[in-house]
Amino acid sequence: YSTQYIIQIGVIEIESNKKDSLFWNTNRLIPLTIEESADYSRKDSIYTVRNSKKYLDSIDAKGNKFKLGKVLTGYTFKNSAEKYSLSYEGLLNIGSLSFNTVQGYNFDSGFRFTSTKNQESKGIYTAVSTKFNYGFAEERLRVTGQFLHRFNKMNYATLSISGGSSVKQFNPNEPISKVINTISSLAFRNNFMKLYNLEALAISYSQDIANGVHLNGKVEYQQRKPLFNNTDFSFLNKSDLYSSNNPLDLNDFTTAPVDKHHLTKATLNARINFGNNYSSRPDGKFNIRNEKYPTLYLGYEKGFASNEKKYEFDHLNTRLTYDLILGSKGVLGLNLKAGKFFNAENIAFMDYKHFNGNQTHIGQSERYLNVFNLLPYYSNSTNNSYFELHSEYNDKGYIMNKIPLLNKLKSTLNLGFH
């Protein structure tokens, strides 16, 4: 990893904004004009007022008013002077309402505490949150919690501890959104989302270990349990049948896709931004990715300490992403992935490598560099070696702007290969 092309684009020294007028009169090459001096003085006065405790408390007092209805809709208490907030999502968190055939209708609520007291000077950030999820068809409440602490914004050292009970898709990338699955299930009885129960406790740590190099390590204890359909409800197409919750056999409603078991997983991932530039300020180091160079991801995953030896495995993986800028002719995006499993002949299905498919045929992103839009979700899942390629060309108007009438639409041409 060469540092030849690393550039520090800018630097602001510590407490440079606290120098007195004598310092600036001595070191400023070109004196400020009268208008500039007046403008700086005015802005300093405004900043002082708007950051005073009296002003901040008055603003908070208006937003912090509590009404009984907030129990249902949610409530946030802010203390801007002390730089912390406490939020509650409410019992009627309509935005979280969704449907799947395991839980039926389900919704989330929760609490979250955040503190940014030393954010400006040191970049310290702390968040403690808990989420409650209730499934009506299951009649079951699941609870998860997380503690997250960022130590600074120089190397972005971050510690996270999380745990609890939740439902998870077999593909950890979760290619099927809750909204899309709700619509496809209730309107068309296409329940593409397949779920299992996860009870876990995890600790992770990440930081920049060199310019452009970010490292993340995680150890997680997991207990996995199979789940089955608990509802047959839909609005339309009631004569059709839902598929089972078994991604290995959609017509098998009695056999579990996995047996109940536990496993400890350790992962180590690195991200390398080649040619990474950055800017230094008193409150942190801010990375500026150099678009001339690709980004490389390296990963190692190990499953161990299981109740059955067959679930243990090793998995090496890598990914390369790159946007080739073609000047006025557009952009060619690339996403290459490869990996290999070892000692993984009988591992659990959720530990397989799953490829992001899309059986709903509804696009969910502006670019399709991480999805196969015609692939069934679990048809090509593997516990062996694999290679994956996505490429997409966007002409940025280079071709479309030359076609009469179509050029009036300001549209772009996209061509993909997967």
Which positions does each model-derived feature cover?
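Gly/Pro-enriched, hydrophobic low-complexity segments
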Residues: Y1-K19
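Short, surface-exposed basic-aromatic patches at helix termini and helix-loop junctions that form
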Residues: F147-K153
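Transmembrane beta-strand segments that form the barrel wall of outer-membrane beta-barrel proteins
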Residues: Y84-F99, S115-K117, K122-F147, I161, ...
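C-terminal outer-membrane beta-barrel translocator/porin domains of Gram-negative envelope proteins
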Residues: T158-V179, I183-K194, T255-A256, Y297-N401
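Long amphipathic alpha-helical scaffold regions
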Residues: K153-G163, Q169, L236-S243
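Repeated loop/turn-to-beta-strand initiation elements of outer-membrane beta-barrel proteins
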Residues: K117-T126, K153-L159, G212-L215, K225-P226, ...
